[in-house]
């Protein structure tokens, strides 16, 4: 996530999915707290519609996109989404512009779902890292130390 947000040549090809049939255990809260408070302006919570220019712009403007209540997509929708996840640049025609412009893909994706078998893709799901969770335990995070270690790595 950090490398994708700070280096134009890096794209995070993996979508983190937290799955649980248990409601209200903190899946969304966990994802929202992956970023320190100072960077939460770069967090978007939405499902990406590839035909919506505002949604595409979020991929170039956000550090993290929370696909809250991600309940799977049809085959065609999933293929389009997988393409968006791995696309190096996002081409957007800004309002009143004559031509599209290319913007670096800075966003990483994470999401929550309410059942384990959320993906129905016979070609494989290498882009999705699914974790089944039964409970969440929250600890106080020293974001300065965490991000210092990430930068060092």
Task: State the predicted function of each range.
Residues 1-60:
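P-loop NTPase catalytic core of nucleic-acid-dependent motor ATPases
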Residues 39, 78-102:
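Conserved catalytic/switch belt of AAA+ P-loop NTPases
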Residues 63-86, 119-124:
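Conserved AAA+/SF3 P-loop NTPase catalytic/coupling segment centered on the Walker-B
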Residues 113-118:
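Short, polar loop motifs at secondary-structure junctions
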Residues 119-138:
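A short helix-turn-beta junction within AAA+ P-loop NTPase domains corresponding to the substrate/partner-engaging
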Residues 132-153:
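C-terminal, non-catalytic macromolecule-binding modules
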């Amino acid at each position: 996530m950090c490398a994708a947000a700070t280096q134009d040549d890096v794209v995070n090809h993996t979508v983190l999915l937290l799955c649980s049939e248990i409601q209200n255990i903190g899946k969304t809260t966990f994802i929202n707290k992956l970023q320190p408070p100072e960077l939460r302006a770069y967090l978007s919570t939405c499902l990406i519609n590839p035909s919506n220019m505002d949604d595409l712009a979020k991929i170039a403007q956000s550090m993290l996109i929370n696909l809250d209540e991600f309940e799977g997509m049809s085959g065609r929708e999933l293929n389009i989404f997988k393409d968006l996840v791995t696309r190096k640049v996002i081409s957007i025609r800004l309002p009143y512009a004559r031509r599209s412009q290319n913007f670096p893909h800075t966003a990483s994706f994470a999401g929550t779902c309410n059942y384990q078998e959320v993906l129905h893709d016979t070609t494989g799901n290498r882009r999705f890292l699914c974790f089944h969770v039964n409970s969440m335990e929250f600890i106080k995070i020293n974001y300065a130390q965490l991000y210092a270690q990430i930068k060092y790595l």
